[in-house]
From Swiss-Prot:
The keyword Manganese appears for this protein: yes
Annotated binding of Mn(2+) 2, by residue: 42, 80, 115, 196
Compartments, as annotated in UniProt: Cell inner membrane
Residues that hold substrate according to the record: 80-81, 123, 161, 165, 168, 196
Keywords of the record: Cell inner membrane, Cell membrane, Hydrolase, Lipid A biosynthesis, Lipid biosynthesis, Lipid metabolism, Manganese, Membrane, Metal-binding
Name of the coding gene: lpxH
Gene3D superfamilies, alphabetized: 3.60.21.10
Annotated Pfam families: Metallophos
Protein name: UDP-2,3-diacylglucosamine hydrolase
Source species, domain of life: Bacteria
GO molecular function: manganese ion binding; UDP-2,3-diacylglucosamine hydrolase activity
Stated family: Belongs to the LpxH family.
Amino acid sequence: MKKTYFIADLHLSENRPHLTHLFCDFMQQLAPQAEALYILGDLFDFWIGDDEESALIHTVQQQIHALSAQGVKCYFQHGNRDFLIGKRFAAACGMTLLPTYQRIALYGESVLLCHGDTLCIDDVAYQQYRKKVHQKWRQWLFLHLPLKVRLKIAEKIRARSKADKKRKSEEIMDVNPDFVLQTFAQFGVKKIIHGHTHRQHIHHIPPHFTRIVLGDWGDTASILEVNEQQQVRFLTGKE
């Protein structure tokens, strides 16, 4: 039976090698069964440019390239941690970069994909930050800094993000329900799949909308499987 997989929020880093092992297991065992794999952002805990080299980056690149070579279409949508992943890395992986919002035909149904951070409009401070860091001139300047400088900046941003997260309420960091309804209408879809909030769940919204939230990866993987009969289930990679 034809199937498609969706993952997000792996936050891969050198400091958490078990996540890389989970990712490799998934890519080698489950992912080859799919027609397509959609990675909806925050594959990495941070990304400072396609020119960075590390054992982790090399491993991830190899895994995605190998899957793509088997005929599985691989797609990537930027997250709030790895929005600087560019064409160079994508090409090396054999994956296609997607815009902030991407509508796809999923076994006869029109579905909207996004990382999910743009739906959290109540977090005003983050939205202001996001607007700044997505300005092309700021990205150009950052990417032309020495790697060591970029790494220090990224570490400071991560530390600040963790501190901010502790201060903010759970409601502010979740999606805005009214904005979600506006997004359904704007893109003419009845189903949205996203990550970012780490709150794995399938929300059924009256009268006929569905919002599927991908989970983050921790002790186990979090994989959404959708098959050609429109059956939906979450997998942990240990099935």
